C-alpha cells in the first residue's frame, strides 16, 4: 500500500517532566540526579495526533530550554503549514534553523528540538494510516514487509558482514532484539550495585548487558567482572566509556578487556577527534568499536562510514534527525555491512520510536533499553519493556502503539507550552 504522508499542522504542544530518582545515573562525564523528559504532541487539521520526544539528558537543566526552543523557534514556522511529508518539514526546519544554530552556538539543542517534532509527525502519519510506525516507515522506504523474514538473535562475530539472509531479524512481525544498558560502575556506597541490577534484568528476560566504564582501571575491571558473573553463561557483554579517553589512554586500556569476549567497546574516544585516531584504535581493539550517538548530520555520518573504524553505528533519533534524517543513514549503514544499534536513554516515547526505526530497517542490531529505574520510561512505553528471551514485541496498534498516560505523570510536570 502507499500511505499518505502529507500533513497540515494545526496544533503543537510541548511538555516537560522530571522524575526524581533514588540512585543517580553515573557516567564518566557527569551524573543524572533526576530523569527529564520533553514530549512533543503535534495535531493535524483533522484532529489526528502524533507524539515525539526531544533528547534532554545533559546538561541537567536543559530540558525546559529545549521545550522553549520547540515552542518559540519551531512552532511559528509550522503553525497552519502544509507539508508533503515529515521529510519536507524536517528539511525546512533544519534549513530555517541553520544560521541560528551557528549564531547561538546551539546546534545540538536546535537539532534535538527538530528531531522531536519530526518523530511526532511520523507517529501522526502512521496513526492516520492505521499502521504501526515501523510498517509505515518501511512503506516510506519502498520496502514492503517480508512476512517470511526471520533472524536468530544469537549473533556471531560482530565483524562479519551480514548476508542477505542474516541482515533481517524477526522485525517482519515487529519483534526486535534488545539489550540492557546504563549499568553504573560499583562504588563504595553500593559495591554490589552492578551485579544486583544485572541479576534483576537477567531474571526479566534480558540476555545482553552494557556497563559504563571510563573510570579507574581497577574499578572498570571489578565492575565488569561482577556484571559478567551476574549475567551468566551465554550472555553478551558490552562496555561504554562515554568518550572518556584520549588515544594514548585508550591504547593502554584496550588490552585490559581482552578476556571478556565483549561484543563492542563504545565511545572509547571523543566523537570529535579525527577518524584516523579511531582507525588506529580499531587495529588493536579486542572488540569492535561502536559510536554514533554524538554524530549529527549526513556529512558526519558519511565520514564515519568512510573511515571503516566503527563496526556498530548508534544514531539517536531524538538527538539528531528523527526518522527523516536517520532512515537514509541507517540504509547506508546496512549497505556498508555494519550494524545499526540505535542509541537511546530517555523516556518511553523516544524509546518506542527507536524500536520502530530498528524494526523498519532490519539488520542484526539490538535496541538499547536503559536498565536503570525510570518511571518516565515504564509509564510511557508499555509492552516494549516486557522482554522475553532478549527480545520485545512491538504492538500492531497504529503509530508508536501507545498513548502516553499524562495523568499518571501530571504531578512531575515542570512546564507546558
Task: Identify what each model region corresponds to.
Residues 2-51, 55-59, 373-378:
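Structured beta-strand/loop patches that form or line metal/cofactor-binding pockets in enzymes
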Residues 4-19, 324, 328-329, 345-417:
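Flexible C-terminal active-site loop/helix
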Residues 6, 11, 43-128:
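Metal- or metallocofactor-binding catalytic centers and their adjacent structured scaffolds
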Residues 9, 40, 47, 74, ...:
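Conserved, mostly hydrophobic/aromatic
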Residues 140-173:
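Intrinsically disordered, low-complexity terminal tails and inter-domain linkers enriched
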Residues 176-193, 241-246, 290:
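Active-site mouth loops of central-metabolism enzymes
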Residues 192-204, 253-263:
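Alpha/beta enzyme core
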Residues 211-351:
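Catalytic core of soluble alpha/beta enzymes
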